[in-house]
């Protein structure tokens, strides 16, 4: 047995780090070291078993006499699951190692230095403000990195996040108040996201962030660190402060200029915020936007997004017919067809829909730009149960009416009116998202064309016997008075006794308990009894048997016997069945076939009667008084009291359980026996599974194929009837034959049900079935409607009018791709495949790509009651916190839920949601998408992509100035032949971006595409190429300048085309301002060819190697300039190289270094030649070092004075740390985490001393 020894102290962050790693090891594939999960011990190991020296906590003993590992980094590394942050060569693994090292060497010392004074553990001479400044400095790199990253290395927590979060636990608990957390908003968001992960929460609980008020008890051992000061010491410190204040006042006086001397220029005032920039030129809807004027100073989403969409729509760019005589015209590029997952017409789209549409539209635009005949078909789903519930709530809220008071026809009129209003809003949202849908083909699942398909499908399947009528157990909502599907059932996990609100009950109802009671054995002289237990005691009134295991020795003597029901005049047989678990409870279970799925199956095997004891509203039936007519949960209390009164109650205890809740009504779902319509799924499921096995249907990510086969292999028949009014009314009729020779039928008897496309057709079929004339047949159509998923399952071909043949059906069915969230793989995707194969003989699509589910920044599921359901338009336009509140008040939430949602909104969006724009939202959502993982969406990251849009804007604006008004681009993008090294380099990098983008689209790897494009524009084009271009465009070499302009134009042209699928608005706006290569160029960017590797084949390894050297030198120079505060000077730089080849390369890129590093002269030293005196040195690569000239730019004497003071302070700090650690009581009294922090601080201080000594030596040579 492995043992993990940890400190019990709640702030012992090294031990917490190990415990959380152990939790991840349990949740994953086991600890990375391959051993078993360790046992936790909250104390130091026995001295007899510890190695020498004694290990620090946490410590891991890998089995008796086995290897000892101690210290948080090593222990966490071993306990963390393999492959989730361990060593490796991948970029993610390198990032993990980088951030773990940063946490251990930078964050922990800074965090302890800032926190310990706050806890009363300040050492002599320690400055709390300086410590806080050091913490801020350590947090800055994290803040920058997390601006565009959810986690430190990848899309899920790794060892890096674990190390950094635990390092910052103390500051977040005791130091960083709300104002500080606003400064480091990205760090705070990331910290909260991590600590709310289940593995963190299991160890840390709820982490309370510092509010500004502190109450801390001084820890044992603090007297070693901060002994109480004597009055003499306090007096001495006061004198020091007084002297310091006088000195500072004197310095301030000396800095003021003498009378008559010119005063320094006042600082420039910040530019006035121009406010919101809007497009105000009169442009009729559908007309092209006027871009002939000057570009605004900065990017504005409102300005950029104006007018483009109506023009795109009027021009027909989104139609598959665009640019060709008809959709059936042969196209060597092929056909791309995808139908939208029709959003429910239940209100507004949320960010989950926005993700779906961002991905789908990006794919659609990419295929369209590749020249394929492209159709993305829009539509809207009637969402039967969801829509009916919302409209019923609205009617009750506004008019105090329910649907039964209104009547079926009048109620349906209300739903249609509501649909017209909400359907338009959903389409408006889709257009604001830039979705390039063909709106002329928009469909609604209740449209006549689609309704005809639904009727045809039902009738065909019923005639073949695939659809049948049967009485079975269904999920029943007593509030909705309807059966509901599995996807409409939420499973609430309870750990024990819990009181839950249930609609229709004034008091909360008890769940999470197991009640035991006794059944007396019939005819037993010894008063023998069998004890059973249940979580639903009221259902014992429907018990028909008691079951035990056939091999249970305790009950063998009861074979053939019965027990007596205490409230009913019936005996219950004791049956023997393998499903019973002998080890659970008494090994005996009650059997209630009409109210439990397992019991129903036992009843079928033993031919037991199923007695329903609840009606559709949840009131008890078929039971004696006093239980008859009681609501089910009132009956629960009555049955319990009656059992106690008869002496049959045997106890109650907490019981972990799952309570099924209707996600529409929040009612507790009951399994009830009801006659319903079912679809036989066995054969269709086999065909769907085989299609994936053969490779005819491809499901991506491939991990979902396992789920697919599992579902198909274990599928049950599908209940498709719903007791609602809104939806497709089932085209089935109950038959009454007015002929004495034909006995009357009963509901479950399928022979007395007939289906038909019309009532007349159904009457003819019924007459033929019973051999009578049609006039002797009376028909009553089923009141129920079809499950929404039935009509949705027909959507890929119902939108084209199946079964009628049409041009669209022949061209676009089967479709190319189905893209949707992985949560509806079974409920929608599987049913489309099964029904498509059954009814058309074809798969509805060739590929299925399943994206992740959007959660909030803390990993929580989107829920209106949590206040984290975000309208994408609120991210696009921005919204105040009050605006978010107002939306809640206009919703159908209960008042209690509104208050809870307000709290969630205030916590997540205290300042509201900033305006981000459509392009930033789309790009951010696609950048988030990682195959197979859910998305914890943080709106602040979306704001970061708005800044990226501003970068595009400014870069293009600069480029247009550089190109000049008379610039004429070459007819092709082919190089001129006189390109400079940096021209060749940027073309090479552009080639790589084109390759990665196309490969990413083909593989549905959206993060790879967005990363490639973001990096090209920001880090290569803007940060490097444009900077290197400035001296060329301002120089005298006209050939070089013209080559540069042509290359720059190519970068803009290709770069905007690359980005267009993700950012259609800003790229169109900028593209329209560029000159065209030919007069016949397409009118819009959205129908311009997408860049392909064959067009952009300028890979140049030689140029890339040269610029990589230039960038390495630049980074080193910038680092030295920052170290010596040379922000306003251009120091000379001398390059020391290891060989002539490196020297030649360095000479070739020296001009680029000069531009990028803001250096003066950049010269390459001859081999072996010494560098000039007074240079600071840094290493750029293994073949090149740089010498930055400081002579004349800094005052050596002044710098030496500052360095000597810094050295003295560092020495004093090191001495204090050494003395503290040498104290006799240190190891016994000081907490272990403080000891580790002291050791890290000492190492950091010694490293600083070495750097200071090097700098002192340099400046002494300059004197």
Curated annotation (Swiss-Prot):
Enzyme Commission number(s) of this protein: 6.1.1.9
Annotated Basic and acidic residues bias: 234-248, 259-274
GO molecular function, one term: valine-tRNA ligase activity
Annotated keywords: Acetylation, Aminoacyl-tRNA synthetase, ATP-binding, Ligase, Nucleotide-binding, Phosphoprotein, Protein biosynthesis
Motif 'HIGH' region boundaries: 343-353
Motif interval(s): 'KMSKS' region: 861-865
Region of interest: Disordered: 218-294
Pfam families xrefs: Anticodon_1, GST_C, tRNA-synt_1
GO biological process, one term: valyl-tRNA aminoacylation
Catalytic activity: tRNA(Val) + L-valine + ATP = L-valyl-tRNA(Val) + AMP + diphosphate
Any one GO cellular component localisation term in the record: mitochondrion
UniProt cross-references to Gene3D superfamilies, sorted A to Z: 1.20.1050.10, HUPs, Isoleucyl-tRNA Synthetase, Domain 1, Valyl-tRNA synthetase, C-terminal domain, Valyl/Leucyl/Isoleucyl-tRNA synthetase, editing domain
Modified residues (N6-acetyllysine): 644
Domain GST C-terminal: start-end pairs: 89-219
Residues that hold ATP according to the record: 864
N-acetylserine: modified positions: 2
Record family assignment: Belongs to the class-I aminoacyl-tRNA synthetase family.
Name used for this protein in its record: Valine--tRNA ligase
Originating species: Mus musculus
Gene: Vars1
């Amino acid at each position: 047995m492995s043992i993990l020894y940890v400190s019990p102290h709640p702030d012992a962050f090294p031990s917490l780090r190990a415990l959380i790693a152990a939790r991840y090891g349990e949740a994953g594939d086991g600890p990375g070291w391959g051993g078993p999960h360790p046992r936790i011990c909250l104390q130091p190991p026995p001295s007899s078993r510890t190695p020498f020296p004694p290990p620090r906590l946490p410590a891991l003993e890998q089995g008796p006499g086995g290897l000892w590992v101690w210290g948080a980094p090593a222990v966490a590394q071993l306990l963390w699951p393999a492959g989730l942050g361990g060593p490796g060569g991948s970029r993610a693994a390198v990032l993990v190692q980088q951030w773990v090292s940063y946490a251990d060497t930078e964050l922990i010392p800074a965090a302890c230095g800032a926190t310990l004074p706050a806890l009363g553990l300040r050492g002599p001479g320690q400055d709390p403000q300086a410590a806080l400044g050091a913490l801020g400095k350590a947090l800055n790199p994290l803040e920058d990195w997390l601006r565009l990253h959810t986690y430190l290395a990848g899309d899920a927590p790794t060892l890096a996040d674990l190390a950094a979060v635990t390092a910052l636990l103390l500051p977040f608990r005791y130091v960083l108040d709300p104002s500080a957390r606003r400064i480091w908003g990205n760090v705070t968001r990331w910290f909260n996201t991590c600590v709310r992960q289940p593995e963190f929460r299991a160890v840390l609980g709820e982490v309370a962030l510092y509010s500004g008020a502190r109450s801390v008890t001084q820890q044992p051992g603090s007297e070693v660190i901060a002994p109480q000061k004597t009055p003499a010491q306090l007096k001495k410190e006061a004198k020091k402060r007084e002297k310091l204040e006088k000195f500072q006042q004197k310095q301030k006086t000396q800095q003021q200029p003498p009378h008559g001397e010119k005063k320094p220029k006042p600082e420039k005032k910040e530019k006035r915020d121009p406010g919101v920039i809007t497009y105000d030129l009169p442009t009729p809807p559908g007309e092209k936007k006027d871009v002939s004027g000057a570009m605004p100073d900065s990017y504005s989403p409102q300005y950029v997004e104006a007018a483009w969409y109506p023009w795109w729509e009027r021009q027909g760019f989104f139609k598959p017919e665009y640019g060709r005589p008809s959709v059936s015209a042969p196209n060597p590029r092929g056909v791309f067809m995808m139908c939208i997952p029709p959003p429910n017409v239940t209100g507004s789209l949320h960010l989950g829909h926005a993700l779906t549409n961002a991905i789908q539209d990006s794919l659609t635009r990419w295929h369209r730009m590749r020249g394929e005949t492209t159709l993305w078909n829009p539509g809207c789903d009637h969402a039967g149960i969801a829509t009916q519930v919302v409209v019923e709530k609205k009617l009750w809220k506004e008019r105090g009416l329910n649907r039964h008071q209104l009547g079926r026809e009048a109620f349906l009129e209300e739903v249609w009116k509501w649909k017209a209003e909400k359907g338009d809003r959903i389409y408006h949202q889709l257009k604001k998202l830039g979705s390039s849908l063909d709106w002329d083909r928009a469909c609604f699942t209740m449209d006549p064309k689609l309704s005809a398909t639904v009727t045809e499908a039902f009738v065909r399947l019923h005639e073949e016997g695939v659809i049948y009528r049967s009485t079975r157990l269904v999920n029943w909502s007593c509030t909705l008075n309807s059966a509901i599907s599995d996807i409409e059932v939420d499973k609430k996990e309870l750990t024990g006794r819990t009181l839950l609100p249930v609609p229709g009950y004034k008091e909360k109802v008890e769940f999470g308990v197991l009640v035991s009671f006794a059944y007396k054995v019939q005819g037993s002289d010894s008063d023998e009894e069998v004890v059973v237990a249940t979580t639903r005691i009221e259902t014992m009134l429907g018990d028909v048997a008691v079951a035990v295991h056939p091999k249970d020795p305790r009950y063998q003597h009861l074979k053939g016997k019965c027990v007596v029901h205490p409230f009913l005049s019936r005996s219950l047989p004791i049956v023997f069945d393998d499903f019973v678990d002998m080890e659970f409870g008494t090994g005996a279970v009650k059997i209630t076939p009409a109210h439990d799925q397992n019991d129903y199956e036992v009843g079928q095997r033993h031919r037991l009667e199923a007695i329903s004891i609840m009606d559709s509203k949840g009131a008890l039936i078929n039971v004696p008084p006093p239980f008859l007519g009681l609501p089910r949960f009132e009956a629960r209390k009555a049955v319990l009291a009656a059992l106690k009164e008869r002496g049959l109650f045997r106890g109650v205890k907490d019981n972990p359980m799952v309570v099924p809740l209707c996600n529409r009504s929040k009612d507790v779902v009951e399994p009830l026996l009801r006659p319903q319509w079912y679809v036989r799924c066995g054969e269709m499921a086999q065909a769907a599974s085989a299609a994936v096995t053969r490779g005819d249907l491809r499901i991506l990510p491939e991990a979902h194929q396992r789920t697919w086969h599992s579902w198909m292999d274990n599928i049950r028949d599908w209940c498709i009837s719903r007791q609602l009014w809104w939806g497709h009314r089932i085209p089935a009729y109950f038959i009454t034959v007015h002929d004495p020779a034909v006995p009357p039928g009963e509901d479950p008897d399928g022979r007395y049900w007939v289906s038909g496309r019309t009532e007349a057709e159904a009457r003819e079929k019924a007459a033929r079935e019973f051999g009578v004339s049609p006039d002797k047949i009376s028909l009553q159509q089923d009141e129920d409607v079809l499950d929404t998923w039935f009509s949705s399952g027909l959507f890929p071909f119902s939108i084209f009018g199946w079964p009628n043949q049409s041009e669209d059906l022949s061209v676009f069915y089967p479709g190319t791709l189905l893209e949707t969230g992985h949560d509806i793989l079974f409920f929608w995707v599987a049913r489309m495949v099964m029904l498509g194969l059954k009814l058309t003989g074809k798969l509805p699509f060739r590929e299925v790509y399943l994206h992740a589910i959007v959660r909030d920044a803390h990993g929580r599921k989107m829920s209106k009651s949590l206040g984290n359901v975000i309208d994408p338009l609120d991210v696009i336009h921005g919204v105040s916190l009050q605006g978010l509140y107002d939306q809640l008040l206009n919703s159908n939430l209960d008042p209690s839920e509104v208050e809870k949602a307000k709290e969630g909104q205030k916590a997540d969006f205290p300042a509201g949601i900033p305006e981000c724009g459509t392009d930033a939202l789309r790009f951010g959502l696609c950048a988030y998408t990682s195959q197979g993982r859910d998305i914890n969406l943080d709106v602040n990251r979306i704001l970061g992509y708005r800044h990226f849009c501003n970068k595009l804007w400014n870069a293009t604006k600069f480029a247009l100035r550089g190109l000049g008004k008379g610039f004429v681009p070459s007819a092709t993008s082919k190089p001129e032949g006189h390109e400079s090294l940096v021209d060749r380099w940027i073309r090479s990098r552009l080639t790589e971006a084109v390759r990665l983008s196309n490969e990413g689209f083909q593989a549905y790897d959206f993060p790879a595409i967005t990363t490639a494009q973001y990096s090209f524009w920001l880090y290569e084009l803007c940060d490097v190429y444009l900077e290197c271009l400035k001296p060329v465009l301002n120089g005298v070499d006209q050939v070089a300048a013209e080559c540069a302009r042509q290359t720059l134009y190519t970068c803009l042209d290709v770069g905007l085309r690359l980005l267009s699928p993700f950012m259609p608005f800003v790229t169109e706006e900028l593209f329209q301002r560029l000159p065209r290569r030919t007069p016949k160029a397409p009118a819009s960017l959205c129908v311009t060819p997408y860049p392909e590797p064959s067009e952009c084949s300028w890979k140049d390894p030689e140029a890339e190697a040269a610029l990589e050297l230039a960038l390495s030198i630049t980074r080193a120079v910038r680092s030295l300039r920052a170290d010596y505060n040379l922000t306003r000077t251009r120091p000379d730089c001398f390059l020391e190289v290891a060989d002539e080849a490196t020297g030649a390369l360095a000479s070739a890129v020296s001009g680029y270094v000069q531009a990028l590093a803001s250096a003066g002269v950049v010269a390459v030293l001859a081999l072996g030649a010494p560098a000039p005196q007074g240079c600071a040195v840094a290493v750029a690569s293994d073949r090149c070092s740089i010498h930055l000239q400081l002579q004349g730019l800094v005052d050596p004497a002044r710098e030496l004075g500052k360095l000597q003071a810094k050295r003295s302070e560092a020495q004093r700090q090191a001495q204090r740390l050494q003395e503290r650690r040498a104290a006799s009581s240190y190891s016994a009294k000081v907490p272990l985490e403080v000891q580790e922090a002291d050791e890290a601080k000492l190492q950091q201080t010694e490293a600083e001393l070495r750097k200071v000594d090097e700098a002192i030596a340099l400046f002494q040579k300059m004197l």
